[in-house]
Amino acid sequence: MKAIFTLLTLLSFSNTEAQQTRYIVKFKDKATNTFSIANPSAYLSPRALQRRVRYNIAIDSTDLPVTTRYVDSVRLAGTVTILNSSKWLNQVTIKTTDAVALAKINAFAFVKSTAAVAARLGDNGLPINKKLDTAIEEPINDITNKTNLVSSTNGDVAAYGRASGQIKLHQGEFLHEHGFKGEGMQISVLDGGFFRYLTLPTFDSVRANNQIINVWDFVANNNSVDEDDAHGMNCLSTIAANMPGVFVGTAPKASFCLYRTEDVATETNIEEHNLAAGFEKADSIGVDVCTVSLGYTRFDYSNQNYTYTNMDGNTSMSAIAADIAASKGMLPVIACGNEGNTSWRYVSSPGDADSVMTVGAVDTLGNVASFSSYGPSSDGQIKPTLAATGLRAVIASPSTGLPVFSNGTSFATPNIAGLTTCLWQAYPEVNNMSILDAMQKASSRFIAPNDRVGYGVPDMKKAFVILMSRGYKQNFCVDKNKANVQLKFKFDHTMTVLIERKLSNQNIFTNYKTINGTAGFTEKTITFIENFLPLQGLTASYKVTVRIANDTSFVISAFDINQYQTCTPPVDEVSINPNPVLDVANISISRKQNTNINIQMVNALGQLMHNITYQHKAGTQVQFINMKSMSKGVYFVSIFAEGKKIKTVKILKG
């Protein structure tokens, strides 16, 4: 199996008899490190540090580069070339045929292990059977026909061309029409090469606007990926294409980092190490979303093979690295795999990681692609997480740059990664797990997930509304028979806020106040005063409705006020931070009235780890759960109010 998820016919390559030349050297610690946790600017960019501050993510030892002295000692042990290092896995890959050097490296006190991982018959740093065309592609007739456009509600035309179906499936045009096309966001694409991205017309706009901000080849160790395999270019095109009326991607205004981590001519777990290094580089730059259309199950050397049992999110190098990437605040979006019709059948790694968005494939009508890998992961996680178009997906041809059809979870993955990026652009104040949770809740099978599409096909408009509602805050105080009411949430000039009121002696709501939004999707404050003297003791009920353009309307809040009330908390709400958590989870609970609260935490096996019951007084209180001694992994915190479960939150212990 090749680790690139398109339905291709690949040339076979066997090097099982070749001499091992590449090894992973794993270190025991990071002692005598020349870098310091106290000075992260030495190894993390300002943007990466801003992300840590924004989402309350601590700098820890995994952020420190591998100890320089260790790396130098390995290099100087003999005829040894250092290939790549991984600070998260605390290891380096090396190239050598020097047996004496290997023995010396194994004897170092700071070396935990040395393992042979790969051989290369060629030594030019390029794939032996490099694919210059991603092959089984189906041309699209009349590709310049512009009748298949998406008409927006505000009169503009989003000229998606042939990509219309794979965007409309998710109502992705809703985000674009409101100005969210990825601008200011960064996406890393980790793949096997980006053939001709420097010249294909698909990326004219990206090149003209300098949207490619970083490039690195972790296989050849150089900064050129234009001459390698076309698969990464195909994936990139589903996000970055900007050919109005012909082919437009899901986040055409985003900035991109292109990383070649996969050697398509071989299949060894050195590529998992490369993937970890790619994640780390993306993190250090400050990338928001990583899209990975790669996966690992079986290798050229059978002793490296995984079994389905290993697909537990905690075994493979790539899954461990993907989860660490999530703990740093990025959102990894991973292909589920194309094993649905094979003996393997199930999700591959790193799609089994527990803190990533794993993507299955459907067509533009939402029908499951038979090749899309099945879930769950071996530890019972719902996999895939969700699904997007990967059956007859529209991608760029490597020969012309024009749109063609192709198949694979490879293309479903970047497609939804781009839309997720646009959603996050609208709500940068929320973290990666909040975005992932909103996407799940906005999907077609959220109530009844299955092993083919997980939570289903996400609706970006619904996810947008979910996050808008979560950001809503309200407060009111009654003083001297007057209620001062304050509402805060994000909205813009395309939106209208309708406040309706009904008194306790009335049967219907009537219009009370209408507020037209102003430019810029930012948090805005609505205030009004209710004078209770004329109401003679009646209770006033309010309903706050948001209208978006001409086709979306939803109630964001409903509340009651009477002249006998005192100040209230904004709404009944629960928030947990930080997430991921290292030591202590802070659980903030706001209630409008005194409430009996029970908080329970269980691990991934359902074992009860924490249980507390207390009387919560009206207002906001914070409870703390010390998780320092708990094992790394996924936990679920459930909040019960008066015996009824009101919220369950998945948190990651890093």
Where do the model's predicted regions map?
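Residue-level detector of functionally pivotal "anchor" positions at catalytic/ligand-binding pockets or at interdomain
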Residues: V465-N481, D551-N577, K592
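Inhibitory N-terminal propeptides of secreted protease zymogens
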Residues: Q19-N141
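C-terminal outer-membrane/trafficking sorting elements
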Residues: L7, E17-A18, V497-T514, Q536, ...
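Substrate-binding/access-modulating region of protease and related hydrolase catalytic domains
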Residues: H176, K181-E183, N242-G245, L258-S355, ...
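Subtilisin-like serine protease catalytic core
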Residues: Q20, I37, S113, A163, ...
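C-terminal subdomain of the subtilisin-like protease fold in secreted/lumenal serine endopeptidases
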Residues: S164, I285-T291, Q425-K480, N516
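Hydrolase catalytic cores
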Residues: L236, Y259-D263, D288, Y346, ...
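N-terminal domain-start motif of subtilase-like serine proteases
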Residues: I82-S86, D98-L102, L126-V189, T199, ...
